[in-house]
Amino acid sequence: MFIEKTNSSLVINESTLFADGVIYINNEQWLLAYSTFAYLCKSNKERSIALLYNMALCHQAAQEYAEAIALLNTAKMQLKSTAVLSHQNKVPSIHLLTDEYHSEHYRLALSEAAVALNANIIKLRIQRLLLDLHIVLENWEEAVRLSALPDMDKCKNVQEALILIKSKTTT
């Protein structure tokens, strides 16, 4: 139970609430996800990469694109400055990497463990989501810049974005 009533005050278990928020995002229950992660962002001065990413997904669903971009940029900077990269796992199979590139897994919520163990993939997911947001906002130059980052050319959404950009900018 994530909310316990004690002496007419509520005590919220934030770990359980975070896990519930991940489930809400992955089931596209955006109203519930948004309120969950907004609460967690408000109650935590130090926001984790996973929290920032998940809140950015909620902002994207709410069409609050500038807020989503700001959170993703913060998460990207935090990823660069943490020791998370020292815990990087090797990907066991090229097939799993190919699946990552061709899927929309980057639109799913992140757990803290996923960030801690897969920093390079998380960085790629942040960049892919940023690209999608800049495409929606028709920020073609930034979208092209993002698409040129390492491994982005292998991603299905990036390939599709480049085709769209070409059609929009050559007419």
Could you tell me what each predicted segment is?
Residues 11-43, 129:
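Alpha-helical segment of the N-proximal tetratricopeptide repeat
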Residues 15, 19, 54, 122-132, ...:
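"A position-specific structural signal for the A-helix of alpha-solenoid helical repeats
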